[in-house]
Amino acid sequence: MTAIARQRAVPTAVTRERRSRLPRALLHAFLISVSILWLFPLLWAIYQSFRPFTETAAAPVALPQTLTLDNYTNAFERMEGFKYFFNTIVIVVPAMAVVLLLACGIAFAVSRFSWRFNLALLMLFTAGNLLPPQVIITPLFRIYLALPLPEVLNDKGLWYDSYFGIAMIHIAFQLGFCTFVLSNYMKTLPKELVEAALVDGASVLRTFWQVILPLCRPPLAALATLQFTWMYNDFFWALVLMPTGAKRPVTSALNNLQGQFFSDTNLLAAGSVLIALPTLIVYFALQKQFVRGLTLGSTKG
Amino acid sequence: MTDRERPEPTTIQPVGRSVSRRTVIKGLAATGGLAATGGILAACSSGATPAPSTGGGETAAPSAGGESPAASAGGSITFGSNYSDDVPKNAMQAVVDAFTAKTGIEVAVNTVDHGSFQDQISSYLQGTPDDTFTWFAGYRMRFFAGQGLATDISDVWSEIGSNYSDAFKAASTGDDGKQYFIPFYNYPWVVIYRKSLFEEKGYSIPATWDDFKALGDRMKADGLVPLAFGDSDGWPAMGTFDILNMRLNGYDFHIGLMAGNEKWTDPKVASVFEKWRELLPYLQEGALGRTWQDAAQAMIGKQAGMYFLGTFAGEQASEADRPDLDFFPFPTLGTEFDSELGIDAPIDGFMVSKAPKNLEGAKEFMRFLATGEAQNIFLESSPNNVAAANDADTSAYTPFQQKMAEIIGGSGAIAQFLDRDTRPDFAGPNGMQGFLQNFINDPEQDLTAYLQTIQDFWDSLV
Amino acid sequence: MSSTPAPLPAAPGSTTRPRQRYSLLTRQDKLVLAVLVGIPTLIHVGLVWIPTIASVILSFSSWNGIGGLENIEWVGLENYQRLPSYPPFIPAVTHNLMWLGVFLLIATPLGIFLAVLLDKEIRGTRFYQSALYLPVVLSLAIVGFIWELQYAPEKGFINNVLGTTEQGNLIDWLGNRDLNMWAVLVAASWRHVGYIMLLYLAGLKSVDHTLREAASIDGASERQTFFRVVFPVLRPINIVILVITIIESLRAFDIVYVINRGLNGLELLSVLVTNNIIGEAQRIGFGSSIAVVLLLISVGPILVYLNRAMRDQPG
């Protein structure tokens, strides 16, 4: 994509000539209105989050008389500080690391196997990735109730209601996408690199660690950004598989905070903004990675 | 789902909090004190009204005499709580602290938000439940007891039984005749209003259906919504069904219908919905998009004149507004069942899970919860319920509570609430919750077809 | 799941390289490779495919979830026979179809249209892209909350602007079942449009530029160029976007669940499955039969996708 974009940086004279001024102004007017329309709901939530409840109750749509941070301190307090954020981190960071590592491994390995096997495996992974989660949830729920886990990982000794269990289902589900992207990427790497390493007597494992992994840094960065956002935003798995409210990641915990916030829309707004903040920060800081992650499949070659 | 605070927050009590160093020390002191006196809180002898808890850990418990099971208990127990709203959560914590202070048994409280707790009760009880947990009387208790997911606490009942009326004992008894449940408090479903508004406008309490409608007309003329209403959670509308059915068709028919002995296609049921239609002009619009909390706010904010709900609606009022709240029973409908004064007054309480790690400690906790002392501590912080135990100190009741006790005591037919009196899968979101919302959305629909759908759904479950 | 991942197939014109096999591998190396393949496969198959198969098997059973497997009663096709008369089933199917219809006919075309506009070299394109794409990084649960602030009956933005907050003229956006699914679809589209826009924009960027120039020189209008030249060339991406749109419609869950747990006009198949297992009384068999319906509908688009994606795999 980058190469193409660069190539396109110089527009041709022909296209430029064909456009008159007026349509261009219309185009901007249209795009600006759409953008404002698109930003509005979020901006409104942010605005509400800074207004005191009494003011909103009196006049929901009005210019502010006072702006306050109280809703944030209040929401933060009721969410018991960083507790739910901490739960998210405990689940998302290891899951992200493991899924990327495993996906790299399998993407590397399948490139050593026959094409037929490779394809079958990729199809299995990709199809699994596309299933609606509700298709598997009922048996998964029973399986989680049956699978034991060392007490170190979960005081209840089960996959059910454990950070580990939630991380595992994220890994299982996201493996498909990561493998697909990484195997496509690896096919673009010069074969000579691996060959040379192997001829030099390096083991497969060493080749993987020292040659392949470093080369995969660009897609890994993009995938990490994307996986963080997806796993952070997940609502469903913890809703069903994590009954202990205190252990839920922040996105699922939000559902339980709703009742308390419901009559107080300002508090709800502040809570939503607080929870959206990490993904917004990641998005603004790593926008390029984010977009690349989603479109990686098309950039090879 | 009946229940109070349905859509509300998860606020989990960090296990560590209840085991602060201070409480540990207090607990140790208490154990010492208890060992010295040899007395143990157990059931109080009937009628005795113990002094309200003076708070000291060393206060000796009223003792039913006899052996001291707690001497061997000690240690710690776990407690799964659905008291997640601020008010009841703090109230429950006070009860737990008093128990720890008294017995030295540490209680690790695992608070789960009310809705999730109920949704997950089945997997919770089958998985690795806490030693003790909060639950409800009625069919819902008998169901889980019948599946072997609760511990029989008949032995505890033999000690505390005299502290409860027969009705409470019956509500705590499983299908096998054994007791599985400790009633803590209950609360009636009534019509709540603000005294100041009624005084200001010169309204009087309606006793009959016609009075009620006439009052509604006056309120409308005064620019008020007569009856606040919110059913976005699906269960509050069940209260309206229950009261209309009990008043029109009697308690026995209502309970029979809940148990599947009567048919939903019975014309008697259709008459309930026809009566409901008469109420519609007085109900707050947009009920399906409104939570009960918001509806309560409308009544408290004097946009609405009255609100038919459990008395827990009072939790929504500020400290300053609370004394201004009053209520009256739902009006009589002029049927032969008026004299029954049937009412929903759900009982909340506690159970012991099937294989508690600390059975003795769990039973000890049950004994404590069965005392008026424990119930008084809770009600002190959450005065929207009335205690279940005979020896609870009612002298400290607010007028609001005294009236609740009166209404419950005066009723000859107490139901638990639709979703506590029938199968959970029938009452759930895909069942009655959805059906009642369907009626509210389109009240003029053909009742024959509507009730046939409900009966078909029942038949598909059994 | 927040978004269907979208690995786009190979861009048109990408070259593939013939593959060679190596025989430099030691036995230990082969073991390492087997482990590298085996562990992820085990996790994926164990936690995704085995439950899928189990869903199918359990759909022929009746089980309230209490006790061990021995309590399962086999009832044949009974669960499926009961589906049509299960009150929320038909509404759920209808709503899933509505969801699909709105996405296919409005949200996805709008996303494509915006991508085409943004593909021109215009000032501020990064701003426009970011604004449109912003909702995509939010979780669907948060999207539900943000839109509740718009739709709330008395305090919501929309009713206050319209002046419809009073008894008598109140518009109950999320409670009225003739309206609420449409209101939810606006919120869902808000997010979906940005997603499609981004994917399509990437596709457009990969189109060989000379194609368009040639058409332009031949005197074709922009619209003609797009429909006759660009769109057909982008066929692979069109298919991917189609599949993503279908899958996203089937996965819809979070927004309606945070709004009212999928009751009262917001029934969806995914919610029915969930409500049959989380709840006081589990209906494992019956819930599974709804899951199987969801599975069967998903199989079609998944196969189309696989066919597309794998065809572009270099051999």
Language model feature labels by segment:
Chain B
Residues 1-20, 30-43:
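N-terminal secretory signal peptides
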Residues 136-189, 213, 240-242, 326-328, ...:
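Hinge/lid segment of periplasmic solute-binding proteins
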Residues 218, 258-288:
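Glycine-centered hinge/linker elements that transmit conformational signals in sensory
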Residues 150, 155, 301, 312-316, ...:
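Mature extracytoplasmic/periplasmic domains
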Residues 97-102, 200-201, 274, 281-284, ...:
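Extracytoplasmic/periplasmic substrate-recognition and gating elements
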Residues 98-165, 196-207, 298, 305-306, ...:
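Extracytoplasmic "Venus flytrap"/periplasmic binding protein-like
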Residues 63, 180-184, 189, 213-261, ...:
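Extracytoplasmic/periplasmic solute-binding protein
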Residues 174, 257, 384-390, 403-459:
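C-terminal capping/gating helix-and-loop segments adjacent to ligand/active sites or protein-protein/ligand interfaces
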